[in-house]
From Swiss-Prot:
Reactions catalysed, as given in the entry: di-trans,octa-cis-undecaprenyl diphospho-N-acetyl-alpha-D-muramoyl-L-alanyl-D-glutamyl-meso-2,6-diaminopimeloyl-D-alanyl-D-alanine + UDP-N-acetyl-alpha-D-glucosamine = di-trans,octa-cis-undecaprenyl diphospho-[N-acetyl-alpha-D-glucosaminyl-(1->4)]-N-acetyl-alpha-D-muramoyl-L-alanyl-D-glutamyl-meso-2,6-diaminopimeloyl-D-alanyl-D-alanine + UDP + H(+)
Enzyme class: transferase
Keywords, alphabetical: Cell cycle, Cell division, Cell inner membrane, Cell membrane, Cell shape, Cell wall biogenesis/degradation, Glycosyltransferase, Membrane, Peptidoglycan synthesis, Transferase
Pathway in which the depicted protein is active: Cell wall biogenesis; peptidoglycan biosynthesis
Function in brief: Cell wall formation. Catalyzes the transfer of a GlcNAc subunit on undecaprenyl-pyrophosphoryl-MurNAc-pentapeptide (lipid intermediate I) to form undecaprenyl-pyrophosphoryl-MurNAc-(pentapeptide)GlcNAc (lipid intermediate II).
Name the record gives this protein: UDP-N-acetylglucosamine--N-acetylmuramyl-(pentapeptide) pyrophosphoryl-undecaprenol N-acetylglucosamine transferase
């Protein structure tokens, strides 16, 4: 067991916190001490892993205008001083950052103290915080084979580990995809969260209404929808004779994913990781306002492997979706190969790979090489 702790720096959204939690679990199982440095949004992390001490420091997202940028710089500066004092006391073996501005103070402070640094990038486009920190990192772990925003110097220190998923999703690896039968039902899961529920709530019911009745009645819909739109959506599907289950949030989403023949949703890093680990085909509609359009890059990677179809939001019309659904209802044969391609692309052992890489960079052993340890960087 290492007496020096391994510090994880993550905060903000779940997309940054989920992989940190997965790495923490893996490291704890191997007998290592783990500490989390986070912002106010990540303090609930301790509820999931009570063995992990949680330290909150100041941070901020990038503000607009001169005043906003000045406030961000001030908050990050204060956070860096707090992190420097904390790390000087903890003397960690390595600090691992998971992107986003909440990770910046701890990683930047670690580099200044000459503590080994690793960063994990969840998307196919390197985030702005990770770009600023990349040159200070001994190790860059990526989720995609190709990552935009990296140069050759970064590439030499990069390893594809994948993006760890929740245990409930990982368990789906043992549940093979059951392809729909010709002339049988087609079960569709529609997700989207706060940034997707509105567009999917408008387009999907209209597309279903355009289908011939004999095809429409073969559909089963499970769909996330905003609370204020639930009743109207239920009434609309009922009038069409379509079996539909709608809710603002599904606590059993992994189980819903396991049962579906096709998923329609966004292309965030966590969504892509879960789809590919589960081995489920999808129609991906990238969120058009994502920073640096990273969701389009995410979707293209899976589509290029044959595991998904991309519909950019301007092209995600009721008519276009109806045509796609008609084709799959008429001939579902493409779904099984797409599911297999998604599964082949995914890395179900991402937590193990990430732990191996981090421990190797810290000089703590357990750093086993993996077949996918080489990656390419798209400049």
């Amino acid at each position: 067991m290492s007496m020096a702790p391994i510090v994880l720096a993550a905060g903000g959204t779940g997309g940054h916190l989920f992989p940190a939690e997965a790495l923490a679990r893996e490291l704890l199982e191997r007998g290592h001490r783990v500490v989390l440095v986070t912002d106010v949004r990540g303090t609930a992390f301790g509820d999931a892993l009570r063995e992990v001490p949680v330290h909150r420091i100041r941070s901020a997202t990038l503000g607009g205008g001169l005043l906003g940028k000045a406030r961000t710089a001030l908050e990050l500066g204060i956070g860096t001083l707090q992190a420097r004092r904390l790390l000087s006391r903890l003397e960690p073996a390595i600090v691992v950052g998971f992107g986003g501005y909440p990770s910046f103070p701890a990683v930047y402070a670690a580099a200044g103290l000459r503590i080994p640094v690793a960063i994990h990038e969840q998307n196919a486009v390197m985030g702005r915080a990770n770009r600023m920190l990349a040159r200070r990192a001994r190790l860059i772990c990526t989720s995609f084979p190709e990552v935009q925003g990296m140069d050759n110097v970064d590439r030499a220190r990069a390893v594809r580990t994948g993006n760890p998923v929740r245990p409930a999703v990982l368990a789906l690896r043992d549940r093979p995809y059951e392809a729909p039968l010709p002339g049988g039902s087609l079960d569709i899961l529609v997700t989207g969260g706060s940034q997707g529920a509105t567009v999917f709530g408008e387009i999907v019911p209209r597309a279903v209404a355009m289908l011939p009745e004999d095809l429409r009645l073969r559909l089963g819909i499970v769909q996330q929808a905003r609370a204020e739109n639930l009743q109207a959506a239920r009434d609309g599907y009922a009038a069409l004779g379509v079996q539909a289950t709608l809710a603002p949030f599904f606590r059993d989403l992994p189980e819903r994913l396991a049962r579906c023949h096709l998923m329609i949703g966004r292309a965030g890093a966590s969504t892509v990781a879960e789809l590919t680990v589960a081995g489920r085909p999808s129609i991906l509609v990238p969120y058009p306002h994502a920073t640096d359009d990273h969701q389009t890059a995410n979707a293209r990677a899976v589509a290029a492997a044959g595991g998904a179809w991309i519909m950019p939001q301007p092209e995600f019309t009721a008519e276009a979706l109806a045509a796609r659904l008609t084709a799959l209802l008429t001939d579902p044969a493409p779904l099984a190969p797409a599911a297999a391609a998604a599964a082949a692309w995914g890395l179900p052992d991402a937590a193990r790979r990430l732990a191996d890489a981090v421990l190797g960079a810290a000089g703590l052993g357990n750093g086993r090489s993996t077949p996918d340890s080489q990656m390419r960087a798209a400049e």
